Amino acid sequence: MSIVKSKIRTIPDYPKPGILFRDITSLLLDPEGLALTIGTFVNRYQDKGITKVAGIEARGFLTGAPLAFQLGVGFIPIRKKGKLPAETVSEEYDLEYGKDVIEIHKDAVQPGDKILLMDDLIATGGTMIAAVKLLKKLGAQIYEAGVIIDLPDLGGSKKLQEKLEVPVFAICEFEGH
């Protein structure tokens, strides 16, 4: 998917020195790139028995919601703590300098739901692992994690596969971090 990869800009030294930030806003601004991205996911996941798509705040919403619409299934927003109004279930995870918490509504998942988990990118995998654990608490089966970008040098997709047996599909990869 070199077309999609070519539409993603790299911002050096953001958010801190030494980081190469992979910015998907340039992809989102490009109608051809956006259509190709969503179309790639639709082609991969249609007719797979997916019952819901879950997206991780905030950029996972950008592919997850339109994909759920195209697949004819519901969308589950996975939010940061305190952002959902009804009863929630939460999962804590480690950050580079501390901890964070993500939540979903308790009634968002039915036991046996076959969930596709979406985000824009997987790096170290911390947020994605927490999201998988959160969905599994409510009885979901995770079909796969779909991302636009994998940063394989940071090991997140490998951890997700090895620790939780959840495969990761990425449209493109970038070396480094």
Swiss-Prot record:
One of its GO terms (biological process) is AMP salvage. The keyword Transferase applies. It holds the Pfam family Pribosyltran. It is found in: Cytoplasm. Keywords: Cytoplasm, Glycosyltransferase, Purine salvage, Transferase. SUPFAM superfamilies: PRTase-like. Pathway: Purine metabolism; AMP biosynthesis via salvage pathway; AMP from adenine: step 1/1. It is an enzyme of class 2 (transferase). Its EC number is 2.4.2.7. GO terms for molecular function: adenine phosphoribosyltransferase activity. GO terms for cellular component: cytoplasm. It catalyses: AMP + diphosphate = 5-phospho-alpha-D-ribose 1-diphosphate + adenine. Its main location: cytoplasm. HAMAP family: Aden_phosphoribosyltr. Belongs to the purine/pyrimidine phosphoribosyltransferase family. Catalyzes a salvage reaction resulting in the formation of AMP, that is energically less costly than de novo synthesis. Homodimer. PANTHER family: ADENINE PHOSPHORIBOSYLTRANSFERASE, PHOSPHORIBOSYLTRANSFERASE DOMAIN-CONTAINING PROTEIN. This is Adenine phosphoribosyltransferase. It comes from Leptospira borgpetersenii serovar Hardjo-bovis (strain JB197).
